[in-house]
Amino acid sequence: MAPNIRKSHPLLKMMNNSLIDLPTPSNISDWWNFGSLLGICLATQILTGLLLAAHYTADTTLAFSSVAHTCRNVQHGWLIRNLHANGASFFFICIYLHIGRGLYYGSYLYKETWNTGVILLLTLMATAFVGYVLPWGQMSFWGATVITNLFSAVPYIGQTLVEWAWGGFSVDNPTLTRFFTLHFLLPFMIMGLTLIHLTFLHESGSNNPLGIVSNCDKIPFHPYFSLKDILGFMLMLFPLMTLALFSPNLLGDPENFTPANPLVTPPHIKPEWYLLFAYAIRRSIPNKLGGVLALAASVLILFLAPLLHKSKQRTMTFRPFSQLLFWTLAANLLILTWVGSQPVEHPFIIIGQLASLTYFTILLILFPIIGALENKMLNY
């Protein structure tokens, strides 16, 4: 019999083992679709980003008008920009659901895969932040000023660090230039990290909703899950196109239609919606250094997930108390997101502080306690 090139060719063999003949647990649900959706998001963002970069000018005097020019005069430039801006929102929706799936089904016990995933999240957040600065509108400028200023909370070297990041004594042309450089570079770094993430995943194989070893019942990825993934792509691309075509500015800030002006501060400086939960946590501590540490902890806490797992069962499928806690955490994150978009005044301050306290309490204290309690309940 002639050798199958798919299985013998050095490059095709790798593709085959990752996407075609990959042994996959037969019972994984739609929650396992988000990994491939993230891949599609990344590809879409890189493609639209490259097309936008071809027409963008990283200069404070020209950045705003170059973006306007792209939307007005470039063939389908408006669509490319709208897809890129709203694609970022979908990227974050997918990654948050992907992380939620990982927490619910105990996927974090694959430590290497989980840790590279958290690094991917941090890189994505950095990419989105520097990208938001590029149109050089009011919120771009003041967002860059406020967030980079947080580095000044670092003891002793803080101020030097901030001025080094700015390339001067305030956010100006050098800042915009380096932010464009970073925004161009980081997605390729994300691609590399994604390959590492997948390499670690394919070492152990996928987890499944029951959290049990599935070696006895695996099926090839293609055609079973490749077909399921295509359905996922359609279900994601449809709302993305709808948003980009009918309501492209729904998730943006109206303030960003005004060119950056260092002499006028917007009444309420806030990041894009997908970073608001961390912003709300940062804001709920009335001390600069404390706020910065809480901001960092809000994401870095994910690294602790494998250490805080105390249950004898891997997933939450058969753990009703942990499920209740998990959905409380999800609701709490929505509250934090909402509070982050509100002005710093009563009652939003106290709501934000309570929600921040709840966030850390659930993850650090209640999850391990409930896990141990459910172990005890197994004996009765």
UniProtKB/Swiss-Prot annotation:
Q: What is this protein called?
A: Cytochrome b
Enumerate the residues binding heme b b566: H98, H197
Q: Which organism is it from?
A: Antigone vipio
UniProt keywords (A-Z) are: Electron transport, Heme, Iron, Membrane, Metal-binding, Mitochondrion, Mitochondrion inner membrane, Respiratory chain, Transmembrane, Transmembrane helix, Transport, Ubiquinone
| Function of the molecule | Component of the ubiquinol-cytochrome c reductase complex (complex III or cytochrome b-c1 complex) that is part of the mitochondrial respiratory chain. The b-c1 complex mediates electron transfer from ubiquinol to cytochrome c. Contributes to the generation of a proton gradient across the mitochondrial membrane that is then used for ATP synthesis.
What the entry lists under Pfam families is as follows: Cytochrom_B_C (PF00032), Cytochrome_B (PF00033)
Q: Which family does it belong to?
A: Belongs to the cytochrome b family.
Q: Tell me, how does this one assemble?
A: The cytochrome bc1 complex contains 11 subunits: 3 respiratory subunits (MT-CYB, CYC1 and UQCRFS1), 2 core proteins (UQCRC1 and UQCRC2) and 6 low-molecular weight proteins (UQCRH/QCR6, UQCRB/QCR7, UQCRQ/QCR8, UQCR10/QCR9, UQCR11/QCR10 and a cleavage product of UQCRFS1). This cytochrome bc1 complex then forms a dimer.
